[in-house]
Structure formats: structure tokens, C-alpha cells
Amino acid sequence: MRRSIDDLPIADLPPGVEDDVPVSWAVAICDDYDDATPRVVLTVEEIGRAGTGLVAHLSPEHARRLRTALRDALVEVGEKAD
């Protein structure tokens, strides 16, 4: 099973960013593993260079940790926590 959840190209970089490479991220679910355990798949790659990015196969525990880190970062920049 593979199912895409969300994706977004991010080309609007803030001024002053020195390593200004526009990237795209995608989140999917996949269970194409020897143990058939579903995992969250996070892909980050440079826009226009499909297939050359980094892919993280996250267990539910690691996906929750990433979710918590993103929530905490949003709070740090003044956004309300969900």
C-alpha cells in the first residue's frame, strides 16, 4: 500500500537565505517493507530534481516526535499550539 497524504513545493524563500534552494516536501504512507508495517514516509527534494532527495521512513513513534518538534517550533515563532 502506498498513499500520498500531502505535498508542497516551497519556492518562496525569505530574503537573505544563503543556501536558497527551493524544495518540495511530500508525506505518504507505505507498508512495502519486509515486515509489512505501515510507516510515514517524508520526502524532501530540490524542486526540479525529482528522485534525488532524501526519504525518511518513520515509525509512528518517530513521526509523533517530528510532529511535536514542528508544533514546538511554531510556538517559538508565535503561532498557537494546536
Please give the residue ranges for each predicted region.
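Positively charged, low-complexity terminal tracts
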Residues: M1-D82
